[in-house]
Amino acid sequence: MLEFSQFDRRRYPTVPVREGYRQWLPSYETTVEDEMDVVLLAPLERVPWAAVERAADLGCGTGRTGAWLRKRGIARIDGIDLTPEMLAIARGRGIYERLGQADVAGTGLEDGAYDLVTTCLVDEHLRDLRPLYLEAARLLRPGGVHVLVGYHPHFIMTTGIPTHFDRATGEPVAIETYVHLLSDHVSAARAAGLSLGEMRERLVDDRWITLRPRWAPYRNHPVSFAMAWGKP
């Protein structure tokens, strides 16, 4: 893990994760783009989407990932998140079987109960990745898959942009952010007994530049990534 402060070019005031997402909630659904995370899910070939009977969505937020999973035909989805206000929105979608407030490293969900565990845009808020991967491995059935989608460390380090939002006043605010190299993920996942089956990266392209014109200088830089980890 690398401290984000050495790459920080914005120097926004920074708030803890739960408080940050509570404050971000009014504009969250309109400012987080599917291009960052959801578009990376469908291309994953090592995930047997049609065979998944039960999924756990860790750091489910407002239910964006859960909604995508439901559209893929996954009927039984449990979700956990740290922020009660986010969970209230997720609950209103009516797609989760169970929802609970918990940390991704200690969900309280059942051992070996899930074919799929998803963690999207969460890892950059964790100082240590190991507890997350250990928890995902605990939740998975043998043969299950943990899909992690993250903010690419290259983009964080190159741009100096943390996870952030604008308050209603227009003031930008950062949410506590850490930088994990891709090798950090490999080390943490292997220590948890998981094996990497597939990885995808999302580049800044025309679609992204239409959404974020200021990102034009970063064309063809990776902005996010997805990893599919299997449990033997």
Outline where the language-model segments fall.
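Core SAM-dependent methyltransferase catalytic element
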Residues: R212-P232
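Class I SAM-dependent methyltransferase SAM/SAH-binding core
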Residues: A56-L58, T62-G106
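A short SAM/SAH-binding and catalytic strip from SAM-dependent methyltransferases
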Residues: L116-L129
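Short alpha-helix
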Residues: T177-R200
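A short glycine-rich, Lys/Arg-flanked "PGG" loop and its adjoining helix->strand segment in the class I
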Residues: R130-V145
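A short acidic, Gly/Pro-enriched loop at the edge of an enzyme's catalytic core
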Residues: A105-V117
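Conserved class I S-adenosyl-L-methionine
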Residues: M1-A50, R64-W68, M86, V145-P172, E176, I209
